[in-house]
Amino acid sequence: MPIEDVLLDLKHKIEKNLPAGVTITDVEFEGPQLVLYTEEPRKFADDGNIIRNLAKELRTRIAMRPDPRVLATPEDSISIIEEVVPKESVISSYYFDPDSGEVIIEAEKPGLVIGKHGATLREITKQIGWIPKVVRTPPIKSRTVKNIREFMRNNLKERKEILKTVGRKIHRECTSKDQWVRVTALGGCKEVGRSCFLLSTPESRILIDCGVNVGSDENMTPYLYVPEVFPLNQIDAVIVTHAHLDHQGLVPLLFKYGYEGPVYCTPPTRDLMVLLQLDYIDVAAKEGKKIPYESGMVAKTLKHTIPLDYEEVTDIAPDIKLTFHNAGHILGSAISHFHIGDGLHNVVFTGDYKYEKTRLFDPAVNKFPRVETVISEATYGNANAFQPALKDAEKHLQMVVKNTIERGGIAVIPAFAVGRSQEVMIVLEESIRKGLIPEVPVYLDGMIWEATAIHATHPEYLNNDLRKLIFQKGQNPFLSECFKPVDSHEARQKIIQNPQPCVILATSGMMNGGPVMEYFKAFAEDPRNTLVFVGYQADGTIGRRIQKGWKEIPMTGKNGSTEMLKMNMEVQVVDGFSGHSDRRQLMEYVKRMQPRPERVFTEHGDEKACVDLASSVYKKLKIETRALTNLETVRLL
Amino acid sequence: MPIEDVLLDLKHKIEKNLPAGVTITDVEFEGPQLVLYTEEPRKFADDGNIIRNLAKELRTRIAMRPDPRVLATPEDSISIIEEVVPKESVISSYYFDPDSGEVIIEAEKPGLVIGKHGATLREITKQIGWIPKVVRTPPIKSRTVKNIREFMRNNLKERKEILKTVGRKIHRECTSKDQWVRVTALGGCKEVGRSCFLLSTPESRILIDCGVNVGSDENMTPYLYVPEVFPLNQIDAVIVTHAHLDHQGLVPLLFKYGYEGPVYCTPPTRDLMVLLQLDYIDVAAKEGKKIPYESGMVAKTLKHTIPLDYEEVTDIAPDIKLTFHNAGHILGSAISHFHIGDGLHNVVFTGDYKYEKTRLFDPAVNKFPRVETVISEATYGNANAFQPALKDAEKHLQMVVKNTIERGGIAVIPAFAVGRSQEVMIVLEESIRKGLIPEVPVYLDGMIWEATAIHATHPEYLNNDLRKLIFQKGQNPFLSECFKPVDSHEARQKIIQNPQPCVILATSGMMNGGPVMEYFKAFAEDPRNTLVFVGYQADGTIGRRIQKGWKEIPMTGKNGSTEMLKMNMEVQVVDGFSGHSDRRQLMEYVKRMQPRPERVFTEHGDEKACVDLASSVYKKLKIETRALTNLETVRLL
């Protein structure tokens, strides 16, 4: 059936299901959802159940778009909204898009604009006709969030066209009589870096992640040139499980080589992704490396990104529904559940996950309506890869920082911008608040502050305890006064030239560049100071050398000459802050999965880790399993 | 390097290696070989070593093409050839192709035209300039062979263009830095029928077999629509391991859907392939089934077919060399050995094979210069799938026929046209010659006689004993007077209406149509007659029903009504004539393979057979192994 007929058919169905007197003028697909055009938005707003019932009946997501002719003027609308919405919500901006009939309201407390079960939103529509969409005013100013929102506002027309195209493609007719499901491993198998998988059926092709291995020139890129994925315009959708570069660093490259389809990820992943992609090409340029794509491709990616919240079942292809679930790894990280066909097969890509409650996140979800195949990460899959408990790691950190401060020293913590930094920040904030460590400034340098701002913008993606603290008690730990962003060369020099007891969190996490190096150079020779590692240090990095006990570190000086830096500062390795499940958690995750899966494939770990984990899953849990190899295709059904 | 530069480079190299005074005018690729153009064919013919040494030096196959201006006239040439060549060779025709400078000589005894180590051929060139190519005059008239030869002669120009294109594609430059080898299963895994595999590297894609499952509408076709193979113009070469329809029946479909490249197979496979393809679409049309392609596509396939003899190492892609070896299954059946890269990986596709000497063929070859991966058939892979020894099968057949004849009866043997028929013929001929069964006519009906004619045209592809019998003793068993082809409806009616003790071999092999049904109807009610099964009877066929013991067989009468046929004739099942290795032979084939392979994948058998064989190969031979699944891709390197 041609798509126009599908739409006509849907329109008839909807009209049959509408209450008497409520009319629509048209229907259209807009990305994964169906939108209804109406001259009577107020009637729809009158009864919150109309849309809900339609969505249930048609088993799809539905939104309503008012006719521009029935809308109040923006001026009138603003004064009405400010009457309807409680002042405490603190609205910071409005953006009216007559084309979609949406008004985007930025508020400090979005919940108050939404009202109970959306009652306030409906009231707004009833009075002004416009459909309000609410976003949070970032509690910490974020350049990234601001730029993304502006960019999206400036490209609404193009965006609408993209969504229309995507929507019509998703809802095309299924044509094949065959039924099969395959997964092709394109990167990240028996290795870490360049994660990339293709999920395919006779109808559809879905790419899951498209990472870059920044540590390798030879194996930097997934095998994107194989016929299963190339030409890229045959791909239906790209899924990004989380924002780390080894999972999404080359998504813009797909657009450079002809991909034109949607990118699905959670809203925080979208924001972090833009931040990390721009930083990636920026760093590559500064290091004189080949830049795989220009910032224009980052923008193009953003234009094509469709954010999906956790637990939102979404059609992404004629025969595939995607649902994201919390993965507990970093902000917005998602376990991706694919429901294929009408009950044909269910496959879960875990992406990176943490099966333990951490300071920031709930443990990864492992309860699904159905699941036959699991493709699981295996970073700590080695038989003996146990990590200390988080509580112990935290105590260790507290002790190290306390000792350093008390002897008048400075604790320098190299950290990745996204993930462990925020975890460590929460621990430090609580320790200071509770008096467990002295009240000293915690400096945040590099992208850490910006990444933290993005965390603060998406509190819904943090765990229960943190959300309670923020929403109910009004205590946002990220806003604590102990945190001091370092936002200029001068600010950094001030800290260096007038050293006082403090904690410094700075990038990069493995000391292969970034502001952390300046602090290190300044503070390495004083034995009162401490260098605290909270993350994994790869071979070949300076961090690794220091861990090995090097006492003299060669540094490139200002004029290019090599100077030897004397290491007198204390070195402490605090294990246990990993965002990955350790061996025990990996096994528990599978063991406690509901329902029990039929087979588990392992990936994202060195060869031994992947094989060890697979072998144990088979031996201990009696589940069919295998470590995947790049470039192989497995048949799931 | 552009291909023109490659050729120029080759020309310089050749000129440097030529003896003083011998010159060439040009070089060009022609399929997998390099051809030299010269005005001095006589000088090349003078010294047989010139071409041989060049081929060794350049590690490629080389042929020489004389300039048309230096050739004798056809008339003069014929009289000179007839002076040079012994009369006993019995030349039946000449075809002069001035474009290639070749003269095709058809002779009853090609060996006498060739001379020792090609001495007579060289003498011919020395005297007339033309390059002689010798083919055998079919000892039994074969419509197929005649038509193919005529067709090829009539399309020499187009053929030359095809070979040039193929040759230039084979010798293109390798561009990828990656090194990997993959095999994708497209059909024939955990099933029999529609065999099809894709062998791929970063440089090349080779399709091995493209069969049709004639017994199934649903699973008739391999998975050709997947992106690894489609669009088909990206495939470098198609290999046909043998002529049965489940291995080659859909090769013409590839051309219908855009394939334009070469098809490699042995010369007998080519001839049998044309016969069986034309019969396949003919039968389908008669049965009112959908015809997958027209005869024009059979012709197109033939135009693109490049025959290769056993043991001939041939470049088929920039990084792949193919060598066929005897598989012992049917005439021309080949084990395909692929050497990939410069010593990178070696993979053997067994196709169907018999690892035992039979009346017609030597046992399948399992000695290779190198081999890492084997993809083996598993038709009789079941743990208990043992077949009686051939000797016992032959004795059983002799006894059955003897008893039938001696009681004045007729032995009706349903048989496939290609394979078992000729095996049974040889046994019957010898039995009659040696007086083990009475001297009665052996009628051959259906395509059996035509297929036998193709066997007689290619005696080089029969085993040592048969070749000796034919070439040294001048006894071609296929020419025995006991064999009586039935070539018309009238001839068949004569046999039926005046029944005399005799043997009748007729198609189809499973009694689902064909002339065998007319004999069956005529002779089923007389208990003196015997129905002798020598091949497998699939479920749902009349043959299978009779084997199960049905005593009344429903038959469609002339006016479409169903008549019940009373089964009074004796039924005998003679096991052991299979062209497939039985379980013991499959295991022995792998066990005695030299060198020992690193891994074995199984295919071409029902699921249990494939899994059983794989499991035993692992347990008993300690070789990594797995039963392949359709649509999966395995990484070999």
Swiss-Prot record, chains A, B:
Q: What is this protein called?
A: Transcription termination factor FttA
Cofactor comment text: Binds 2 Zn(2+) ions, which are required for nuclease activity.
Q: Could you say which EC number(s) this protein's record lists?
A: 3.1.-.-
Q: Which GO terms describe its molecular function?
A: DNA binding; exonuclease activity; identical protein binding; RNA binding; RNA endonuclease activity; zinc ion binding
Annotated Zn(2+) 2 binding sites: 246-247, 352, 604
- Record note on quaternary structure: Homodimer. Interacts with RNA polymerase (RNAP), interacts with the Spt4-Spt5 complex.
TM ranges: none
